[in-house]
């Protein structure tokens, strides 16, 4: 069977990669529900996964435990599959304050949120790709387990038009209004339509650069074409048909809304009786007033503020049933890959409990009907039941993944570059600080970097101060530092602006720094979460991308976790040495551009190239640097400002300037994903 995917890479699988790819693909073909890819740091796990996806030819969801890792994966997969649908599905809130009630102070906090339009467009594009294409790869965060609109209602609301259809223009306009598109004959933006005589232009909600033009002759669809909404130039002429998707995942047919209102009225009457029976008069009045207002809004407008709390009625689900999520859009033969599974799996399980306790307060005190409890993320058992065939990916898989996979674990211990796992030394705690200082001096002389991990914030601060007093260029990475600043600190370490980075639990997953040749773990014998076998292996792995990689564990005794971590690292190192000797491989240093950790690859590869006037290199560099230091909120404001400028240029028929500004907006949007 020919795969729908086209993998583009200058490399061929090497080291343990061919065997891992073969094992995982055979497992998928044999119908294995759970497999694990145990891949050491720097062994090219992403490339292995790209090969597995390409060979299997299945639509795939890759889940990451945070937006930073999701953005990194998105960039890498975009580079591997430039001609396929690689999409990004993370939470679209720039800011989110859920509604809550604090009984002790009698304080009700209204829901407040700010939705990022670009991420919303990418989410719509992701579900569209899953519904339309076999070659869809969706990079998602844990927000994938939260409720999304019912796919059946979403599909039933789509507007299909074919050349030669007999349909009245007013009927098309009514259908577009039902899909929550707005008419705007002045500013043509995403999620709007405009009418000029018998020509109807629609800017689809999931599209970035393409709009649809429907030309009618009387009541017949005469021509359908695709055009650039900015310049007006035709992209595809005379299309046989087109499909317009709803503006939001939560769109619902009018009949369903009316049915839901009737059911809400019945449940409201029951809840009022219940509250009165318990002598809760204030709560009874509160639930009555709030729900009646919502019913009125739904009746008049088709939606209301907080309509997600009535999602059970709108999707026709029985009480307690799991909400529809991204997994309901994934075809039956879909594939799920969970990256850094030892963290992501536990995150999936934790989401439900926190949401539940907040909602129970709202229901108990009459702010919401009990149906609000069904607007929630999936429980872990529901996630397990809905998840398709799954591959867990980690250098240190958790108990859950190992139990589920059993013997179906593909090991990727050998790196294509021949690099070995670090040498591990155990040294006494008594002299750890002075010993560390002398080790730092040895490394900095040859231009290498050092990571130091401590147990407490206080110790990190004191150590940073001590090292700085002794002339070491050192920085401290702590939990108060936001994602953007964190990325900048890592970049500065790689560039050599400082030599030593001190932290607590921040030097683990997803940090690729080939310049780091030494990882020092202070108080390694203090058994606990930060010094568990998994944490130690992850920290040791940070030195695995350097030819001179070494890890020093400062401890007065060997704990169980240390013994396991040292044993596992030595087992891997032994296998790597044997492999190198057998094939005559000489380990080579990993070359990774410093820019790689800040950029998402060429996301605009397949988009129109517009030649802009030459700029001075210094100007370009300054511009890029200023974008990197912006917060997501600042970037969003800048995008809005530039978009307004772009549309003004288009209205003034200055298409070259408009296209130039559009390229700038594209850069900002890519940076937004990294910075968020």
UniProtKB/Swiss-Prot annotation:
Pfam families: Helicase_C, ResIII, UVR, UvrB, UvrB_inter. One of its GO terms (cellular component) is excinuclease repair complex. CDD domains: DEXHc_UvrB (cd17916), SF2_C_UvrB (cd18790). Residues 26-183 form the Helicase ATP-binding domain. ATP binds at residues 39-46. It comes from the Bacteria. InterPro entries: Helicase/UvrB_N, Helicase_ATP-bd, Helicase_C-like, P-loop_NTPase, UVR_dom, UVR_dom_sf, UvrB, UvrB_inter. SMART domains: DEXDc, HELICc. One of its GO terms (biological process) is nucleotide-excision repair. Residues 636-671 form the UVR domain. Disulfide bonds: none annotated. It is found in: Cytoplasm. GO terms for molecular function: ATP binding; ATP hydrolysis activity; DNA binding; excinuclease ABC activity; helicase activity. Belongs to the UvrB family. PANTHER family: UVRABC SYSTEM PROTEIN B. Forms a heterotetramer with UvrA during the search for lesions. Interacts with UvrC in an incision complex. This is UvrABC system protein B. It comes from Aliivibrio salmonicida (strain LFI1238).
